[in-house]
Amino acid sequence: MGNATQVETDSAALMAEPRLVAETGVAARIAHIATPVLADLGYRLVRVKLSAQDGMTVQIMAERPDGAMTVNDCEAVSAALSPALDVEDVVKQAYRLEISSPGIDRPLVRVSDFRRALDQEARIELRLGLDGRKRFRGLIKGVTGAGAAAVVTLERVDAKPGEAVEAVLPLDDLAEAKLVLTEELIRAALRAAKAALAEEGEPEEQEEGGGEAAPAGKAERGPGRFTPKPAKAKSAQGKPVKAKPVLPAGVKTQFKQLKSGRLQGLAREGAPALRPTPK
C-alpha cells in the first residue's frame, strides 16, 4: 500500500515538473494548448517544433511520466489534440500533425531528464554561455539543486588542451540539450526494455546462436539493426496483417493519420503524421 502511494506521489510530481525550455511564436501557442490536453490523458509535453519543409508540419513530442510512449499512446494524443488545435485555429494553413515519443537520443527538457541520463553523453547549449562558451559535449556526471536553480556537472569530451574537463552548467541558462546516440545508450535502452518486460512477466526471446535476448515486441530502428523482422501474419483473405507493436521507453514512436481517416501506428523515424485538412 505504501509503495503504491509513493509511486502515485512520484508520478504526480513528475507530471507537475516544469520544462526548462520554452517555445516561441506559434509553437509556444501550440504548446500552451497541448499541455493541458496531454496532462488530462496522463502525458507530459516534451517539445513542439514547426517545420516548413515539404509543407507545414507540427511536430509534438510527448511521453508518460516514466518516459514511455507507445504507438497507442501516440494515437490517443492525436485523437485528443487534433480537434483542440482545430478549435483554436493556431496554424492558419494546411499542416501535418506528427505525434512522437522522445526516442533514445531524446531532448533533455526537465531536471528529471538529466537525472535519468547520468553517465550518458549529451550535447548542451546555453543561451548566454559560460566563460564565453555556449556549446558543450560530455558525460552527465551529476545534477544538484531543483528546478531552474539546478546545475549539471559535465565531464567534457570536447575539451581542448588547456581547457577544464569538468564544466558546471546552470540549467536556468539552458537553450537546448539532447542525448548523443551511442552504442552504450542503445545498450542501456535495451537493458531497460528487458527489465520492464521481466517486471510484467513477459518471456524473453533468445536470439539464435546465443547472445543477448531481445525484448518481445521491440520495434526496429532499421533492417536488422537489433533483431530480425518477424514473419508477417496473414488474414483469412491472404492479405498481410499489420500489428501495432508495444514499444519500450526510448524506442522512437510516431503516429500518422491517413487522408481516408484510417489510423495507422508507426514505429520508425522519419514518418510524418498526416492530418487531413478540414473541408
UniProtKB/Swiss-Prot annotation:
Gene3D superfamilies: RimP-like superfamily, N-terminal (3.30.300.70). One of its GO terms (biological process) is translation. It is found in: Cytoplasm. InterPro entries: Ribosome_maturation_RimP, RimP_C, RimP_C_sf, RimP_N, RimP_N_sf. The keyword Magnesium does not apply. Residues 197-279 are annotated as: Disordered. Its main location: cytoplasm. The keyword Transmembrane does not apply. One of its GO terms (cellular component) is cytosol. Keywords: Cytoplasm, Ribosome biogenesis. Residues 199-210 have a biased composition (Acidic residues). It comes from the Bacteria. HAMAP family: RimP. Belongs to the RimP family. PANTHER family: RIBOSOME MATURATION FACTOR RIMP (PTHR33867:SF1). Required for maturation of 30S ribosomal subunits. This is Ribosome maturation factor RimP.
